[in-house]
Amino acid sequence: DGNDRTEAAVLKMLTLSRDKATESPDEVLGKLNIVPLTISYEIDPCDVMKARELAYGAGYEKAPFEDLESIAQGIQGQKGHVHIHFGIPLNQASLSVPDAVSLIDDAMVANYRLCKTNFWACEALGYAIDESERGRAEASITQSAFLARFDELSEAERQQALEMYARPVINMMASK
């Protein structure tokens, strides 16, 4: 949904193989050298599929092999500009799960490379965006072509698709 968050349960699982007699979960988590990784796409090749699924929530029924098709589309589909950012490793002597979640989430928001598509989605949803906040990167797609991707969607699906693209801008502005 464009609102990427660290799942605390996954971090807790990483601490399960510790020697419970000699190591605390916080010590183990601190030693793992977790590196926050942020991948920013100008275009999500699965945006329409995700929007349909998210718009209908629990009432959505997947077609046979839809997950496999989504994976293939995600790998092979056009993404436009892609930015991969490796953050600073989390290697404190002791690191609690809530602190790790907060550090990783903050790094993802700070290191996300906003694209013009993110700002176009905000505009389409009625958000006022300061000119100084806009992405400086050249777009590999025009604004009209980007918005046309959602022409065949229902209003609820279109809203969901635009929110997926707008969410990184909203998260970044909220963190300031």
Predicted feature residues:
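Membrane-interfacial terminal anchoring regions of lipid-handling membrane enzymes
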Residues: D1-K176
